[in-house]
Amino acid sequence: MVEERKPHINVGTIGHVDHGKTTLTAALTTVLAKRLSGEGNKSVKYDEIDKAPEEKARGITISTAHVEYETENRHYAHVDCPGHADYIKNMITGAAQMDAAILVVSATDGAMPQTREHILLAKQVGVKDIVVWMNKCDVVDDEEMLSLVEMEIRELLSKYGYPGDDIDVVRGSAVKALEEETGSGVWSEKIMELMNALEKISLPVREKDKPFLMSIEDVFSIPGRGTVVTGRIERGVIRVGDKIEIVGLREIQSTVCTGVEMFHKALDAGEAGDNAGILLRGIKKEDVERGQVLSAPGQIHSYKRFKAEVYILKKEEGGRHTPFFSNYQPQFYVRTTDVTGNIKLPEGVEMVMPGDNINIEVSLDKPVAIDQGLRFAIREGGRTVGSGIITEILE
């Protein structure tokens, strides 16, 4: 039996630079630590988050701070990235696999370019739910101004396909909440209001009943214990003693899971949605690499060719300024790996303009573990130029 745990949800703060994402992250942990007991609730200071450890996601260095907190009903893992470029990379690479996002908007500025960009990205990478934290409300006396900013955000969310009229918008001040001694002041109540909005979000359907699959983010060698791979379990359950395969980039290898760890605790099992470390029997560190997947035996194969529906970003969205033609060769970011591939355009299509939606055929340089419905990003020269979804596997 997997031990009974509180339902787990992955959230992240998104929004424009300097609107207060990191301050809010600090305020959430601090107010909850004062208000609620729970081993997950420890207050984390702003500069601990701001000097976030660097992670490698798809070969790109990203600073991400992971904090955890819990309410009576749920356990939250929360990711905050101090840098703007880090957010973009993080959302596309899935390093911040968010079930829900807290969109932070400063009441003094309203929606800004990155606000739009982050909402668009959240939609493209499949973040289902958003709640809004209107920050810095302590410095705006004008009620009408606050209402205008709120209306603007709701319209923006609707424009990108979120239910803008129904989304919770909480007006608060993260700085003021941090200053309050007890955790029960007027601004701390606003933090609790935000938590209540998060509590209302329907729990993501974790694909626990499907065969186990986890994309490998990192590989470590632990003296005396062997090789550990880390990543987020995409679907299924892994128990100590289960047979598993390592698929993609190389020949398939078979091994056995000899340990599961999460937040430095040993567990009997890990399940969909968990960020876990898996100990592998008889596998050396050099036998396995980031970008491969761990899978229940026989469930996934690696392929080089597929068809996909892609959206090519406009220049204003940070995409290409010029069209591309058949045989264009960008990088494809699939799960935790990036591989060069060749794009073949459909019959009769000469070129693709920024802003186009198109069906393409892709031939990758190396075989990667993929399946239908999988999302990926297309990048070139350090920037994202498109995103897509696999519609058909060819070989």
Swiss-Prot record:
Major localisation: cytoplasm
Organism domain of life: Bacteria
Alphabetized InterPro entries for the sequence: EF-Tu_GTP-bd (IPR041709), EF-Tu_GTPase (IPR050055), EFTu-like_2 (IPR004161), EFTU_2 (IPR033720), G_TR_CS (IPR031157), P-loop_NTPase (IPR027417), Small_GTP-bd (IPR005225), T_Tr_GTP-bd_dom (IPR000795)
GO cellular component assignments: cytosol
CDD domains xref list: EF_Tu, EFTU_II, EFTU_III
Coiled coil location: none
Residues annotated to bind GTP: 15-22, 80-84, 135-138
G3: region residues: 80-83
Catalytic activities: GTP + H2O = GDP + phosphate + H(+)
Location of the region described as G4 in the Swiss-Prot/TrEMBL record: 135-138
Positions of Mg(2+) binding: 22
Subcellular location: Cytoplasm
One Pfam family linked to the record: GTP_EFTU
Region (G1): 15-22
Disulfide bridge map: none
Domain tr-type G, residue spans: 6-206
Record GO terms (molecular function): GTP binding; GTPase activity; guanosine tetraphosphate binding; translation elongation factor activity
Its EC number(s): 3.6.5.3
Residue ranges of the region described as G5: 173-175
Region (G2): 59-63
Keywords, ordered alphabetically: Cytoplasm, Elongation factor, GTP-binding, Hydrolase, Magnesium, Metal-binding, Nucleotide-binding, Protein biosynthesis
Function: GTP hydrolase that promotes the GTP-dependent binding of aminoacyl-tRNA to the A-site of ribosomes during protein biosynthesis.
Protein family per UniProt: Belongs to the TRAFAC class translation factor GTPase superfamily. Classic translation factor GTPase family. EF-Tu/EF-1A subfamily.
Name of the protein this chain belongs to: Elongation factor Tu
Source species: Ehrlichia canis (strain Jake)
